[in-house]
């Protein structure tokens, strides 16, 4: 009887024509989960949509902007989902699977024009064998709800659906809503990052900070790298002036200063590499943005301390696009003013019954905004996914291959005017700070002997800060039985992360004459040199290494290092969770996280070269007139810090959390216990003379591995009777989080959270002698609201850190590298804010930003003396991004204009607050044209005003020193003006 009822009701729907209303409506809807997307479409079209929440649960609706008929707009919205629609009354449309039973694997039913009703045969009914008990009851509930919606205008749906089937997932109905209900565009968005179960959580209910971006929104940012994208997050300051790889990412109120120790980059919920505080490595350098990304979710703190890698900072989770029942794809080409040529592509569709696939990626080559006379960026990425759906869940496999080379950029010479907070920076003579860099054909190659009698080390700057990685993963989500679900995320990553770059060394430019005079003084102070040379030096000869021409004594020169680093990485992670519905509205999650990882490093730091202080520098040979050779083929010295180490780590964590909804309240609490085990070896080194000739000044004091090792192993340490040191290698720590959200209305909520997290020491921390575990206590309260024209999200926080290690390589007066280490705490208070206002139709005004008051405390060790109470290095007290955007409807096509003004406040480059980085502002803009349903043209530009913004001062200068000398300074500016033009075809 029930089956007959389903068929009768379904057949009554089939013969009803699609909307005959051919008038145009204006739509502006972003890519988002299908439920919220359909709700927003209903609101903007002023119609009723009826659909089952089960049916749309795993789908994403497409972005639509412009003027369309209701039928055309709905087709565009549902493009790629495999869903179809039928009219059931004058103002009501029902959403269905192509075959009417929710199976997305079959080809979608073509929707006829409004003037031509579909024949009944257009929607075949499958046999009863395809309908399990749960789906049958869900469909009956949906169809009863449909009858109520048609009869009563959609207002009696909820009660009838609940009466139909209390245990089935509640079908959803979207009706025209007033201004107060326009929250579905943002607050109804379902997020999966930082949540206990794979089903996710509405943003309205999340008791923590989360920022989301669709693929289209990611493109609008115009990010130069995966790190640069994080500027959409209110509390993130990403220093991306180093290029597509190798950034510094600062989180407001979190300690930092180098790399990105408090940022995890994940793919589909699995961290790419589970240790985040290694030198010459950050997660963002292992990831590239392209068309294979569906959306990004960035969570800051909150419940992140419980799940996955337990990141107490930010987790940027990138969800990959998957194939759907309806084949879709796109291909595009982008050209840029920096000599950029880039091709992107994506294709996804069905492979077999219940199987779906996707492939995509990019390839690009670029001269770079700072041209180096060879490709600055060259490489690409390929990603594939395979998804299988079955009655009780889904499994998705993915593979990602990244092979890329990126120019690494450090500090350049600048003119410093003024002092303290009044300092300003301008161009050094002959060196454009927006487009210049030392690298060029003359400095591209390195050949240097690093040990007595061994073959020379060779390296190429064109290999840059590269990545050669292979990543494989899978996500399994199963409904085990009533009230029990399972989620398992597995990922394996392996590959090579090399660094070949010029690192400026601790002293601003000086004239060749002044440099030679200092070298003469040093050589004459060495008795062995004077004896071998037959007396003291009184003069010098300097020539260009490339052509032998004499160098003018007034030419400015510098000594910069050609650093060569190789990191061989492997990691395996598994995140397994069971979620139990203990009783209605209460869910308990228990889980286990395992990470096994290794890093095999070989470093050659130093390799200092004497070069001109100009873009595309020339190497200089310098010889004193007593025969002493200061620089040979530009080299003033070989490796001053040679490191060979091998480390392995294993982290095992168990966690439990519970969420409980009580009327308008949603509470959650959880605890995590984690053990870390680390072992490894470091080869010791000895300072050696590479030959017996005292006149060869360039090969003295070379760091050479000597075959002896320091072993970091708990079992060995215990055998040697040093149990205290064993504690450095094996640690067990706990983390916890408690939060709650109160929903005042369906479009307004407030939340509060308290959590304590830990940050385990990395391999580098053990090597540097700072093996302590960091701790954070976080307190925050937030408020979210959305009306038809306004969205606001405000978070106020108090964060306390302890046991944070500090490490920096500084250059001594002799030119050698010294490793400066100490530990400290942090006291931080601040506010994050996100807002969007639409004062008139088509115009939106958006803002994101942060204000903070964060200072050092509890400094331990002389290296940080005097820093207590100082402002955290590199972090602005205030930063904000303001983006007005305007949509111009043009019939079947439309134009979108946007402009972004960014303000970055004053910062300090060092803990001693002596190296001041002035505030600056930038202006970015873009125009996007959607031409019909298939073509998109995008014109974007960044830093249009060519602002000189400095992100760091001399990275090798000791804390507490100004980093300037004689009006000269070193600093790393942001990139100058850049523009790109892209054309994409969608099919």
Model-derived features: positions:
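Extracytoplasmic beta-strand/coil segments of soluble accessory domains associated
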Residues: 176-179, 191-195, 199-202, 207, ...
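Short acidic/polar hinge/loop motifs at secondary-structure boundaries
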Residues: 271-300, 424
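A beta-strand signature from Gram-negative outer-membrane beta-barrel systems
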Residues: 286-330, 986
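Short strand-turn segments of transmembrane beta-barrel domains in outer membranes
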Residues: 315-350, 359-372
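Acidic/polar loop-and-plug regions of large Gram-negative outer-membrane beta-barrel proteins
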Residues: 376, 382-389, 394-471, 498-563, ...
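Structural signature of Gram-negative outer-membrane beta-barrels, strongest in the C-terminal barrel
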Residues: 569-571, 581-597, 602-606, 610, ...
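Gram-negative outer-membrane beta-barrel transporters
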Residues: 661-664, 745, 791, 798-800, ...
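C-terminal beta-signal and adjacent terminal beta-strands/loops
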Residues: 801-805, 842, 902-910, 928-987
């Amino acid at each position: 009887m029930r089956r007959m009822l389903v068929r009768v009701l379904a057949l009554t729907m089939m013969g009803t024509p699609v909307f005959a209303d051919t008038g145009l409506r204006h739509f502006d809807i972003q890519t988002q989960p299908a439920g919220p997307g359909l709700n927003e479409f209903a609101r903007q079209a002023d119609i009723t949509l009826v659909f089952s929440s089960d049916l749309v649960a795993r789908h994403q609706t497409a972005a639509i902007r412009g003027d369309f008929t209701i039928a055309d707009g709905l087709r565009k919205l549902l493009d790629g989902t495999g869903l179809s629609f039928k009219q059931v009354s004058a103002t009501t449309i029902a959403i269905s699977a192509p075959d009417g039973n929710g199976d997305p694997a079959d080809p979608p039913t073509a929707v006829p024009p409004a003037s031509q009703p579909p024949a009944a045969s257009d929607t075949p009914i499958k046999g009863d064998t395809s309908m399990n008990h749960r789906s049958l009851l869900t469909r009956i509930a949906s169809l009863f709800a449909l009858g109520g919606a048609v009869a009563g205008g959609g207002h009696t749906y909820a009660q009838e659906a609940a009466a139909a089937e209390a245990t089935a997932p509640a079908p959803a109905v979207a009706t025209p809503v007033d201004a107060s209900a326009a929250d579905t565009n943002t607050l109804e968005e379902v997020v999966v990052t930082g949540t206990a179960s794979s089903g996710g959580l509405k943003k309205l209910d999340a008791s923590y900070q989360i920022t989301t971006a669709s693929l289209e929104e990611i493109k609008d940012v115009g990010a130069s790298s995966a790190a640069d994208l994080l500027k959409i997050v209110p509390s993130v300051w990403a220093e991306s002036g180093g290029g597509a790889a190798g950034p510094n990412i600062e989180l407001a109120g979190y300690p930092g200063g180098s790399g990105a120790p408090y940022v995890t980059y994940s793919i589909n919920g699995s961290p790419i590499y589970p240790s985040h505080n290694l030198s010459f490595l950050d997660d963002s350098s292992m990831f590239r943005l392209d068309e294979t990304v569906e959306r990004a979710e960035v969570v800051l703190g909150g419940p992140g301390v419980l799940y996955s890698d337990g990141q107490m900072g930010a987790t940027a989770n990138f969800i990959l696009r998957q194939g759907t029942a309806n084949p879709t794809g796109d291909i595009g080409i982008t050209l840029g003013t920096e000599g950029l040529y880039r091709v992107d592509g994506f294709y996804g569709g069905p492979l077999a019954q219940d199987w779906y696939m996707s492939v995509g990626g990019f390839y690009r080559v670029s001269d770079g905004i700072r041209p180096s006379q060879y490709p600055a960026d060259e490489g690409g990425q390929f990603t594939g996914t395979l998804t299988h759906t079955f009655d009780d869940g889904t499994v998705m496999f993915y593979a990602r291959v990244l092979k890329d080379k990126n120019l690494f950029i450090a500090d350049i010479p600048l003119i410093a005017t003024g002092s303290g907070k009044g300092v300003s920076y301008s161009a050094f003579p002959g060196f454009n700070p927006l487009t210049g860099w030392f690298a060029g054909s003359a400095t591209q190659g390195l050949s240097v002997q690093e040990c007595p009698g061994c073959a020379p080390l060779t390296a190429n700057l064109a290999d840059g800060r590269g990545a050669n990685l292979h990543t494989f993963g899978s996500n399994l989500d199963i409904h085990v039985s009533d009230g029990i679900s399972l989620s398992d995320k597995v990922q394996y990553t392996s590959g090579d992360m090399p660094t070949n770059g010029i690192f400026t060394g601790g002293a601003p430019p000086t004239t060749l004459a002044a440099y030679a005079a200092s070298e003469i003084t040093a050589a004459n102070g060495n008795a062995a040199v004077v004896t071998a040379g037959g007396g003291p030096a009184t003069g010098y000869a300097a020539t260009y290494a490339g052509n032998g021409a004499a160098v003018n004594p007034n030419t400015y020169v510098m000594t910069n290092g050609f650093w060569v680093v190789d990191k061989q990485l492997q990691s395996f992670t598994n995140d397994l969770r069971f979620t139990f519905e203990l009783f209605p509205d209460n869910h308990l999650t228990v889980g286990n996280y395992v990470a096994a990882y290794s890093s095999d490093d070989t470093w050659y730091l130093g390799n200092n070269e004497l070069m001109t202080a100009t873009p595309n520098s020339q190497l200089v040979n310098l010889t004193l007139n007593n025969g002493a050779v200061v620089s040979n083929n530009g080299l003033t010295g070989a490796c001053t810090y040679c490191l060979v180490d091998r480390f392995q780590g294993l982290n095992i964590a168990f966690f439990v959390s519970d969420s409980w909804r009580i009327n308008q309240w949603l509470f959650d609490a959880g605890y995590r216990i984690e053990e870390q085990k680390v072992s490894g070896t470091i080869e010791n080194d000895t300072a050696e003379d590479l030959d017996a000739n005292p006149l060869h000044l360039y090969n003295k004091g070379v760091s050479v591995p000597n075959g002896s090792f320091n072993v970091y192993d708990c079992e060995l340490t215990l055998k040697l009777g040093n149990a205290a040191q064993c504690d450095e290698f094996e640690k067990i720590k706990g983390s916890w989080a408690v939060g709650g959200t109160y929903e005042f209305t369906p479009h307004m909520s407030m939340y509060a959270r308290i959590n304590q997290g830990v940050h385990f020491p990395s391999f580098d921390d053990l090597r540097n002698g700072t093996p302590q575990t960091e701790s954070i206590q976080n307190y925050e309260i937030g408020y979210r609201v959305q009306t038809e024209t306004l969205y606001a999200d405000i978070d106020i926080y108090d964060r306390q850190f302890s046991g944070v290690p500090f490490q920096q390589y500084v250059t001594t007066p002799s030119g050698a590298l010294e490793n400066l280490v100490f530990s400290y705490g942090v006291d931080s208070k601040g506010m994050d804010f996100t807002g969007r206002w639409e004062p008139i139709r088509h115009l939106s005004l958006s803002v994101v930003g942060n204000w903070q008051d964060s200072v050092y405390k509890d400094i331990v060790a002389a290296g940080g003396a005097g820093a207590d109470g100082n402002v955290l290095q590199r972090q602005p007290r205030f930063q904000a991004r303001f983006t007005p955007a305007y949509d111009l409807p043009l019939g079947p096509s439309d134009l979108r204009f946007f402009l972004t003004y960014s303000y970055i406040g004053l910062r300090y480059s060092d803990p001693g607050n002596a190296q001041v980085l002035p505030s600056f502002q930038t202006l970015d803009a873009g125009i996007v044209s959607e031409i019909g349903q298939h073509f998109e043209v995008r014109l974007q530009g960044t830093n249009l005003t060519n602002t000189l913004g400095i992100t760091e001062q001399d990275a090798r200068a000791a804390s507490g020193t100004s980093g300037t000398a004689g009006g000269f300074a070193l600093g790393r500016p942001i990139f100058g003006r850049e523009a790109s033009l892209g054309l994409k075809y969608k099919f």
